[in-house]
Amino acid sequence: DFELLITSNRYFNRFDPDFFNPDNLREILFYLPEVKKYIIPDKKEYRVGEAPFNVLGNYGIYIDKNKDYYFSTIIENDKKYSTINRTINVDFKKMKEAVISETQEFTGHWAITNRAMLNLSNNLNSDEFKDYLTTSGIKGKKIIEYSIINKDIYQPIYNNPFIVKSIISAESVLINNNKTNKKKTKRYTFNLGSVIGTQSELYSNNKRINPIEIR
């Protein structure tokens, strides 16, 4: 059994179950209540799984085979569906540059989006995509090794991770402080923030007026 789900993109239109708006009827999915998963007919990159991120958290109207209907918030059944796991090893080569070996495992929406960009995008700049997947934001980095595992759109295993392995080198993340240091002990500053990327502070001392919206 399945149910027809009609909703809208939450980034453009919030579905209001109490006020009819034809713009609410923009996205069509099929919901499988027994397994709590969705089929998205108009997105090639999706298979049977969680609802796409652009409708999560929005309201929708669910219609069953008897034409009975109900309104409900679209939720993610598996709270650990979308993750990014990183393993990073840093080696300082003669204290002149850092060699960064990294393995990244993307699951859920992260994996789906990366596969779609790699396989379906007509405007993809391969160099920009490679930069994005190999610690973007580091000035003057050199990519020594770069490989992707499980990159095809079709994956025989549910929520198979999209894995990126890379080795890069960069001088910009290692700063020599010995020029101004009069002590005999040599000191260096390693810019860890550039390696792990920009972090967002989601907490606040004041009560939020609107909920956090993450894209």
Feature names for model-found ranges:
Residues F2-R215:
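A sensor for short, sequence-defined functional sites
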